Structures are given as structure tokens and as C-alpha cells.
Amino acid sequence: MSGDPDRPAPLDLGAGRLEAFSDAVMAVIITILALELRAPLGPTVKDLYDQLPSLFIYVLSFVFIAIYWNNHHHLLRATTRISGAVMWANMLLLFCLSLIPVVTEWLHDFYRSPLPAASFGIVALAAAFSYSALVRAIIRANGRDSLVGMAISSDLKGNLSLVLYAAGVGLARFSVCAAYAIYAAVAVMWLIPDRRFTRGAGRR
């Protein structure tokens, strides 16, 4: 097995089981999010227009969770060893993602207010930190010369996301539109396919 021979071997709890559990939790989170989506209050174009902010918030939240599901899938598919630290880091990520429906519901009612807008960024920032912690735990369990270790030798996009989320939280006090624009920009940035795992597999 690759990795440092002096490092204690982690308990192999099965990446497949961890991925299946995480998929189920994320599916529940998306279901809760969808149940909170509100229909227009009337049959007119104006009623539909009035509902556009809530629709934007729903789409942003849905894409946010979908991005994490996609990256989580590729991350665990490149993982061969799962340690206890990986399990806990994964639970922390799921906890942060479970807060998305809460802040989304708050934004539905108060999308013009700075605090709810900043709260979305805080949850997004916490999720980004927890995903980074999960990546580090997986690399420690598998070794830096493993597929996942080579694929994520650097994480410029992840670090940039942290900076942008923090900027969005700070800007929410002065302009909620600017904060939403930053959150949306991060989502668009992550919609671009990540080729790191493919490149890492090619170097094996």
C-alpha cells in the first residue's frame, strides 16, 4: 500500500458505505429544500415576478448542495482507506450542509436583510472549511502518493472559495446584492468540471 510506512494504518470502514450514507443525507436535505419552495401567490405575471427572489435563493441553495454532492462523489471514488477522522470530518460536512434549508427559509422571508444574507455566506464558509478538513483527513489516511493525494496536491479553487465567501459575508452588511453575486460566482466557478482526479488517475 502507498503512503508512509511509519504512519499507523487507519481502520478501513469502506468508502462505499460512507458515500451511500452521505448520499442519503444529501438527498434528504434537497428534499427539505424542495418542500420549502413556494409557488406564486396569484396567477399574474406580477405574482411570478414577486417570487423571483425566492426562486433565485432556491436555485442557489440547490446548486450549492449539488456541487458538494458531485465533489464528494469523486473524492470518495478516489479513496481506498477510511479512518475515524475521515468519518468525523464527513459528519461535520453533512452537519453544515443540513443548515442550508434553514438559512434558505430565512432568506425566503428576509432576502433584503443583511443578517440572513450574511448567514448564508457563513454556512457556505463553514461547509467549505469542513470539506477542506475532509480532504485533509482522507489524504492523511491514504497517503500523499495515493490517487487522492496526487489529485489534490493543491487546492487553489477551494482556497479562493473561502476568500470569496468571507468577502460576501462582509459585504452583506452594505449590499446584499453584492453578497448574492459573490455566492453565485463561487457556484459558477465550481460548475466548471474539475479534472484533478482524472489527471491524478493518469499519473498512476
Report each predicted region and the residues it spans.
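Multi-pass alpha-helical transmembrane bundle typical of ion/small-solute transporters
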Residues: 2-204
